[in-house]
Structures are given as C-alpha cells and as structure tokens.
Amino acid sequence: MACSIVQFCYFQDLQAARDFLFPHLREEILSGALRRDPSKSTDWEDDGWGAWEENEPQEPEEEGNTCKTQKTSWLQDCVLSLSPTNDLMVIAREQKAVFLVPKWKYSDKGKEEMQFAVGWSGSLNVEEGECVTSALCIPLASQKRSSTGRPDWTCIVVGFTSGYVRFYTENGVLLLAQLLNEDPVLQLKCRTYEIPRHPGVTEQNEELSILYPAAIVTIDGFSLFQSLRACRNQVAKAAASGNENIQPPPLAYKKWGLQDIDTIIDHASVGIMTLSPFDQMKTASNIGGFNAAIKNSPPAMSQYITVGSNPFTGFFYALEGSTQPLLSHVALAVASKLTSALFNAASGWLGWKSKHEEEAVQKQKPKVEPATPLAVRFGLPDSRRHGESICLSPCNTLAAVTDDFGRVILLDVARGIAIRMWKGYRDAQIGWIQTVEDLHERVPEKADFSPFGNSQGPSRVAQFLVIYAPRRGILEVWSTQQGPRVGAFNVGKHCRLLYPGYKIMGLNNVTSQSWQPQTYQICLVDPVSGSVKTVNVPFHLALSDKKSERAKDMHLVKKLAALLKTKSPNLDLVETEIKELILDIKYPATKKQALESILASERLPFSCLRNITQTLMDTLKSQELESVDEGLLQFCANKLKLLQLYESVSQLNSLDFHLDTPFSDNDLALLLRLDEKELLKLQALLEKYKQENTRTNVRFSDDKDGVLPVKTFLEYLEYEKDVLNIKKISEEEYVALGSFFFWKCLHGESSTEDMCHTLESAGLSPQLLLSLLLSVWLSKEKDILDKPQSICCLHTMLSLLSKMKVAIDETWDSQSVSPWWQQMRTACIQSENNGAALLSAHVGHSVAAQISNNMTEKKFSQTVLGADSEALTDSWEALSLDTEYWKLLLKQLEDCLILQTLLHSKGNTQTSKVSSLQAEPLPRLSVKKLLEGGKGGIADSVAKWIFKQDFSPEVLKLANEERDAENPDEPKEGVNRSFLEVSEMEMDLGAIPDLLHLAYEQFPCSLELDVLHAHCCWEYVVQWNKDPEEARFFVRSIEHLKQIFNAHVQNGIALMMWNTFLVKRFSAATYLMDKVGKSPKDRLCRRDVGMSDTAMTSFLGSCLDLLQILMEADVSRDEIQVPVLDTEDAWLSVEGPISIVELALEQKHIHYPLVEHHSILCSILYAVMRFSLKTVKPLSLFDSKGKNAFFKDLTSIQLLPSGEMDPNFISVRQQFLLKVVSAAVQAQHSATKVKDPTEEATPTPFGKDQDWPALAVDLAHHLQVSEDVVRRHYVGELYNYGVDHLGEEAILQVHDKEVLASQLLVLTGQRLAHALLHTQTKEGMELLARLPPTLCTWLKAMDPQDLQNTEVPIATTAKLVNKVIELLPEKHGQYGLALHLIEAVEAISLPSL
C-alpha cells in the first residue's frame, strides 16, 4: 500500500521511430561503425587488443560518448503526446510524425502484454518550412447507444510554426485545418467535461485552447466535436463514393490579445469562475478606486494564467458575454494517401471548380480575425525569472510552474499567490495525480465520534504533485499543499513525463457516469528500456505525518515482511515478535493484509501459523463487539477452521493403519457384481491396456503423493457462509488436494470412515468430496492398475460418501436419474484415463445397485421373507433408469478402452523415413470426445493412428479377413500367406492384427472397411497437403481410395479430394508448364506449385490415378446401392460434425466427359514431367473449347470439343505422342540393352510406373490421332533399341502391316550398313563386293547413327528380315530388296557358323 511505479506497456520497435525522425543518427551510427575499423568484421583476432594501453588517444572515446548521448536523449527533442485512454501516442519532430497504436502481443517469455507499434508515419507539413510545435491526442466519445461514454476514435491536433492548427485521424488523414493567427503556435491544451464535486462549483465547458506569442484562442468543445465528426464522416463517404457535397459546421472560437506582458511561453486555461461578493468588491476597488460601481450579481469570468517574463506569471480574466464568439471558415482537406478521385470529390465539398482554381485557393491564406485586447490584471513580478511551463491541477485549484532557475513553484489559482517552492529541479517536467478515498479503508473507531452515527460522508480527494528531474534521473511524488515527499524512484535521465490533463471529449453529466475507461493520469516514457510506466499513489499517503496511524501500520507491515524473510533458528522468538506486530496494527484492512502474508509464508511451520491465528482470534473476541471489524473476525475464524481441518487430516494420514484382509479374484467379482467370465474379460482388457499404454512419467524423489504444504492448502480452500468451497484452481492442484484427502485411504493406509467423518464435519459437501475422489482416482491410473486392492477401498469410500446427507436425494426413485450418480458418470465420460474410468464405473455401478436394491427391499419387505430378501439382494438387481445408464456407460468405456489400446500400440516397423507429421503424438481418447466427434469420430481416430504407423491398406484388409473367416484354424494360414504380399517393413506387426480384429468386432459399423479406408484416404491427403514434399502420403491416399469397394463412397471421396486439395495445384502446374514450354525446374515448381519437381511428378501421376478412379466409379455406381451408414447401439447419442463418408454420399454425379478431358490433360502433364520433355506447351494441344473447360467443377456440364479437329492440332498431338513413346522406350531400355522378357515396367520412386505405350495409344484415341501410327512407332522404337522379342509381340497389334514392314526394312538396312560399312573388316568388304549393286547403293544411303543399339546379333537381324518379308506382299516395290537382304544376312552369318 505504498507509492509504486508500474510498467503497463512496451514499445514494439521504438528504434524504427527514432530512425525515421532522426535519420542522421542512423547514418552517424553506421558511418561511425565503418570509420572505427573496417577490418573488425573480418579480423577478429585484433579486435580490442591494445585497449588497455595508456597512450591511447581519448578523442574517439569522447566522440562515441556524444553519439551515445544523442542516441538515448533524442526523445527530449521531440513533441510527444499520449491519449488519456492509451489508444494512441504521437511522436513528432520538425515536419515528420509517427503515430503509435497499442496491440496485445506475446513477449519473448510467452506472456501477453500490450505493445505500442507504428500505426502510421509520414510528413505533416503542408507549407514549406513549417514545423510541428505542439500536439494533442483527444479521444472523442461515441454516440452509439451500445457504447455510450466510450471512446469512438482519437483525433490528433497538431500546431505548426506557420500558425496553422490541423486535425488528423489515427491513420494520418487530414480532416481540418485552421489558421486563426499568423504567429507560430506555442502550445495546445484541452479541457474536457468533469462532473462538479460540490453543488457550488461552476460547471466547466469543454474547450481547446491555442497559445500564440501574443494571443490565446479558445475553441468551444461542442462546436469542435461536431465539426470533427462531420469532417470524418465526409472523408469516409468521399472515399466510398466521391459524390458528397456537405459543408461541415464552422467552429466557434474566441481570440484574446494578451497585453502588458513581455514574453509568453506556456499557459493554463482555468475556466469559468464566479467571484464571491467580497472578492468582487476588492477587485472593483483595485481597478476603479473607492468610487467604483458594483453590480448586483458577480460577473462570470474566464481565467487564464500565463508563464514567461515580465511578469513571470500573469493572471488574465475575460468577462463572459463581453465579446461575441467568432465563426471560422473550415478549411477541409484530406491526406495524400487518398486517391485522386477523392481529391476531386473534396474539391466539390469546398466549391472548387478546376485544378488551377484549386491551387489558387490553397495558396491564398484564409482571413485572420483580429484579437480582442485583454490586459493582465496582476501577476508575480520577477524580472530575472523566466517561466518555462505551467501545469494545472485536476480540480483547478492549484498550478505548478517551472522556471529557468531550477525551481518548481506551487500557485494558489484562486488567490493568485505562490504557496510553496522546491529547489534543485532544473529542466523539470511536472504532472498531477488525483486519488479518491476508499470509504472501506477508514478507521472504524472514528465513526463513533460522528454525530450522524455510522455515516462516513463522501469520499475525500487528495492531489499529489509528480516532479521528474531529468538531470538527476529521479521521479518524485509530493503531497500538496504542504505535505511531505511520499515516493521517489530512479528512472533514468532520458525519460519524458506525460500529463494529458483531460479525458474524453463529447461527454456530459449523463454519459460521463455510464462507463469509465481505464486511464492513466501520469505516464513516463523511457526510450532506453522501451517501456511506458505509470505511478500508483494510495490515498492514505495524503494523511501521512508523524501522528498518522496508517503510516505506523505500514511501517509495521514492512517490518513484518522483513521478519518473515529472515532465517532464524529460534522459531518461538519469531512467533512472539509476529504476534506483537500483528496486534499492534490498528487498521482492520492492514491487519487482514498482515495475516494473509503470515499464512502465505513458507518458512513458518504449521504450529506457528495456528498459534498466531488463534492469538489474533482471542484478542478480537475479547474486545467490545462494536469496535471489532466483522470482516476481520470472520476471516480469522475461517482461517482457523481450515488450519484445524489440515491438522486433523494430517493426523489421520500419519497413523499406522493397514488393511490386512486378503483379497482374491472371487472377492473382486462379488464386489463388482460380475461373473467369472466377465471378470476374466475385464482383466484381459486391462492387461492389454497396461501393456500398450505404459507411459514413462518423470518423478522426483521428493515427490510424495498425499502430502500438501499448509500454505498451499490454505490457498486452495475458502469458507463462505460456513460452507467450505474450493477456489478456482488448476487440474493438477485439484488432484493434489484430493490426494491429500484420499490417497492414503485408497491404499488402505488410512481409516476411510474417520476421513469421511472429518471432511463432512468441516463443511465439505458430498458432491465436492466425490469430485475430489474421482479426480485422484482417474489421474493416478498407473498406480491403481498395479494395485487391484485399491478397488475395494474405492468401493468403501464411495459407499460412505453415498450415505452422507444430501448425497442422494431422498425423493429419488427408480424412474428418474440421480444427480449423484450422474456426477460420477460425467467424470468417467470426460476422463482420458480409460482404464481407471472403467474400474470406477464398475465400482459406481455396484454401489448404485446395492443402494437401489436396499431401497427396493425396504419397499417390499412386508411381502418378502427374511431369507428371500437376502437372495433378492445378492442375485437380483432392481431395475432403474440409473442402472440402464450405468450399463450404457460400461459398454462405452469398454469400447473406448479397446480403441485407446489400439491407438497406443506400435508395430516394429523399420521405415526408412519418418515424417515430422507422423511423429506428432496422438491425443488421448475419452467417451466425451467420441460422443462429440460425430459419426466418423471413431474411424477418424483410427485413421490418424494408421497414418502415424504408415500401414499399407493390406494390413486393414487382412485383419478384416480374419474377422470374416468361418474356420478359426484356416485364417491363420491364409493370413500368414497374405502377409507375404505386405512389404518387409511391415512384417513384424506384433499384436496389432489381434487388436485391429478386436476393434472391428467392437465397432462393426463405425470401422466398416469402406468407412475406414475413406477416413484413411482423407487423413493421408490432409497430411500431404500440409507438406506436399511428402509425395508418398498422396500415393498412399490413392491406395486407400482404390480399396474402397462401394462406388458411391469412392466417387464422393475422390471428388472431395479433387475440389479441396488438388485442382488449385493442378491448375498452377498446368499454367507453369505451358508458360515455360517444358518440364519446369525445381525452383519454379516450388514457387508456383509449392513443391519440388520430383514431388510434382508424383503428384501428377497420383492425380491421373484419381481421375481414372473417378471415371471407373461413375460407371459402376449405378450397379451398386447406396450404403446405409449404421451406428452401434452404445453410440447412438453421438453428436458433432458430419462424417467424411456422409459428405461423400452427398456429392453430385460427375460429368464423365469433363473428367475424361481432365484425365487427358493430366496424362500429358505427367508425361512431360516423367520424361523431362522439352518444347511442349500442353495447352497448345487443345482448342479454345478445350482450354475453357479445364479446371471447372467436375459435376458441371461444359462445352467440350466435338467433331473433326483442325489438322494442325492433330499434327502437333501426333508429334507429342510419338515423342512420349520414344522417351518411354528410351527410359525403359537405354540402361540395359537387352531386357528379360518377363520383367515388368520399371518402378518409380513412388510406386510402379505407367504402361506408357498403352497410355499413348489410349491418348491417341481421345486426341483423334491415328492409333496405328503410334503402335507402328512403338514397334520401330523397340527394334531401334534392339528389343526385337518385344517388337515381335507389339507387331500383332498393328493393323497396317505393309507400312510397318517398309519402316522395319529401313531399320534392317541401317543395321546391315553398320555391320558392313562402319566396321570395315576384310570379310565385310569382300561380302560387300559380292552384293548386288542395287542393294549396295541402298545400304550406302542408310544412316546407322539413328540406331540406338548397334550391338544386335546378326541372327536376330535375320529374323527381322524374315519378318519383313512375311509382312510385305510379293507385289510390293521393296519385296525384291528384302529378298536381297536375306541373301546378305545369310552370307554374313556363314563365317560365324
């Protein structure tokens, strides 16, 4: 409760504002760094060496100090203003200004804090050479009913050396400009509405006062408020339409010419004042002598005080009504940020006609009205003293003045005299803080002397003067008028003290009472630390003197705090001193504060705390009842009860108590009302859960369950009307409190009955105790599962709690739901520790059944014999609504447990690469999460697990086959055989197939195979979208999509994938490849598509698969019925988002030709990327109709190309397809010249490659290119690469074999030409000489360089020649040439035989 300085805001980047306002400082720093030593950045070994030498020159050091001073003291040279609502700060220098706005951001430490960030920066000058001299940030009140009294927006008022006063918005938009005097503006000050504290105080009007060297102008606040609102509305309308032509209302102002004073530096407008009759007669006598006439009523006057020289302080009084207010011509303008259209609109507002006339109007200054003379009435004459600033107190009774002698002088405004002076404050900055008394802090004893009984009267107000001395770097707070210094802080020498002295403009006596914004009267801006601080001064410091009891109390509190921090071995002595100190404190509020600090001490043992509280309680009870504060007495009593409860619980926990009763499985089955089979099933489930759910928890040796310090215990609990409640604490703290009460009881180490009786007697409700008990049980799952005996303890504890009063309502019957059991079920539903939740639900169900049976037994006791009633209790369970809810909960918890066990299981897979997305841990499940997850929540959670484990779809299929198998022996072999098809990485799956099988049995509807594959498909594509570089995710997603059997689901999922994730990237890839005309490089792919070139190749291949799946599903969906999505009986109440499968079934039918059209484009793009083709523009293969149809909704009907295509398009398409075939054959057969006939297509990094020749033929069919041309080219390429055996197979598909034979004849000639002409052996030359001339000439014309494989055996070529003769008709022109070739080939073959 002492004076304090509080940091409430930071600057996000104050250096940026400094560099903008002082560009030379930034240049000096940069040039200085380069000037010192250019080699420092590279030669670190010489950096700083020799700095200790004595003969080092001192000049650079002084220069550095000067630069450092300029760097830190720059704020002193700026014009600074802060809005009183802290929503805007202005820093200006010369022509430039920076507007700073607060934003909530997280600091480096993760704490949310308010930071001032640059909202606007720029130049404010309009005329050449004018500079900013003063600035104000005035918040304007909102006129909306919903926000009455709150600030709507903040206006920035800026005065210039040219005499102009301009008004801006927060975004730097110029609203209004006024030239009321041609001299420079010296100071701007504002006064806003304040509710008068007393009925006799004159109500002050709002105004803006502008000080000039020889005049003062006051603008009426109401007029200014309306004008600014109108100007702001016009700017907003002009920005929207540009057609507004509304003239804002003129400003009403008064202008006084101050006379009989040499210089004026600052001023204060006190407002309207009315003299008392005595003061009226005294003033009249001083002015007019003893014969002066006196009016009947004292006139109202506006008082102004100026500081300067001759006189040092001048007092001016302007009679109200002596002059009429002047009306200004508003010069409306807009900021340079708005467009030229807005300037044209603005010209319409002011009646400007043309650009030439507009410039003329701007250059012509408005008419300046003459000032009304106003002579100084009196002053404080001091010819040598020059005033520097004046600051008026909040209640307008005092004013503080600084001068050039380093003095701060306190003035009595009403009397016009100096009443106090402080010395030694050169360049001081001053402000005021007004504090209102809190009536609750008054001493109750003093109320007895009041003649009005307990009436304490209105709150008092205290004023404190704040002085900042920058020369000494100290901030002081003084109590006025003659009070002592109540606070002093070291704050640095480069700060600025801001005291606005006003609040929100536009309020009145009604709206000012509605909502009070948070305002700081004083703000200290520290540019070094980049922070904004304020000062808090409690009211009681105004009463501080040598006789003040509160000051004495504060001294005792400080002494007590110091005593609590000391480490003393003699605790008895410390306890005695603390008792004396707390009993000496007089004020109840301070005494309560002292007791709170004692109870919060960690160094005092429990006995000390109890004795001190008991002593204070006894002292208060011994006093008279009227003089004792009831709040303090109740506080002590409550704390004493808590201490007694803590002692009782600690004693019960420390007793040596053990339950030695043996506990068997039969006992557990009877306790939980389960038969042997059900118990074995429960134990098996929990054992699997324990194995898969073991989590390593870090524990320290000092951590002990069930131990709670007394300090923490007191912080958690509170009494309210004799009822013990728990404060709002975190979950961990809640568990710690519950462990303190129940942990030893759950382990059988403390008496359960005694603990329940103690807690009930202390005032804890059964509902609260049940909540604590369950929080402990559910959070300590690992310990509970390791110790089954704790189940018996929980059963006992729950039975005792249920028997307490108000636990179970006496009016409860079997047809209604008991809130008691509903509370327990809700805790189990919300728990993520499913093992502990399932056990507690079994215990709760057993206790509830026992109580229900007892109630039923009482009802039917008259008709049932005693022997039968025992049988009734043991073997029969009374039917009730609660029983049904328990059974439902047990089924849900069992399902959730099995699912949680599955999700925490891990296969021993050794994947080569694990993505960071797969490394993210899965969230734990609870029944509540599954109920709120929608119908697809269960499948979605399993899909996330499958993604994390990266299992292939075959694993899901195998587990499902195991479920469908009829013979339990055969599936094992079938599963083992099928596992050979799964990759080696997934061989060792451990218990995962069994767990999956169990989950399938538990969720036959939610985990139906199509539903699971759909969710897995969606999960993989979602994760791929997060990191498109992981192309294997997209490939795996397509694999799951292919596994979906139902065509309706498959169609919907594929269509959703395309629309949500693929079409944008697909279109980007298309336009990029069409732009570059080839396979784009990695950098371009990353920039435009967001993935690498390798990933984009796989992406296009997967897109092609997806489009083909879409077409296949569309064909087969008419033959398959729409699936019915069922839900398990236990999960019928599930709510939440619609499932992926339901969304898929809602999708429209696709337009098959449009999908086929996209598939053709995708094939082209994939081929270009797969084989790095060049000089290919994909879109150039389509006409305008084809291009326009791309990337449209696949369910819409588009105008597609039809009829005969332009031959030019067909020619280009044919060239492209032949190029694809050539590239495909080259990619397949260039590495090894001879291939195994049984070898399949070469695999790509992301799966098997396409059958490109077949795909090219299919594309030829859709692109109106002759398919036979493509097939013939494929055959020719195969023979070209020497793969004759594959070529013979491909010949069978060619229709025009005659043309093919001619092409193959040329290829045969190339092979023979290479063998005879290019090898140039002796035998070859002799053979060439024996050949017919026609054949020899033809062979010489062949170019063997076109051959891709020249090492084909001659026997293979002989087969090719025979094949050509077989294909050529005898009448063909080249048939004879082919016969000659046979002879040549046979002749070449002879030497090798």
Swiss-Prot record:
Q: Name one GO cellular component term.
A: autophagosome
Q: What is this protein called?
A: Rab3 GTPase-activating protein non-catalytic subunit
Q: How does it assemble?
A: The Rab3 GTPase-activating complex is a heterodimer composed of RAB3GAP1 and RAB3GAP2. The Rab3 GTPase-activating complex interacts with DMXL2. Interacts with LMAN1.
Give each disulfide bond as a residue pair: none
This entry's Gene Ontology molecular function terms read: enzyme activator activity; enzyme regulator activity; GTPase activator activity; small GTPase binding
Write down which residues bear the modification named Phosphoserine: 39, 450, 916, 978
Q: Which residues carry this modification: Phosphothreonine?
A: 901
**Reported tissue expression:** Ubiquitous.
Which stretches of sequence are listed as region Disordered?
Answer: 36-67
Q: Which Pfam families does the entry mention?
A: RAB3GAP2_C, RAB3GAP2_N
Give a short account of what the protein does: Regulatory subunit of the Rab3 GTPase-activating (Rab3GAP) complex composed of RAB3GAP1 and RAB3GAP2, which has GTPase-activating protein (GAP) activity towards various Rab3 subfamily members (RAB3A, RAB3B, RAB3C and RAB3D), RAB5A and RAB43, and guanine nucleotide exchange factor (GEF) activity towards RAB18. As part of the Rab3GAP complex, acts as a GAP for Rab3 proteins by converting active RAB3-GTP to the inactive form RAB3-GDP. Rab3 proteins are involved in regulated exocytosis of neurotransmitters and hormones.
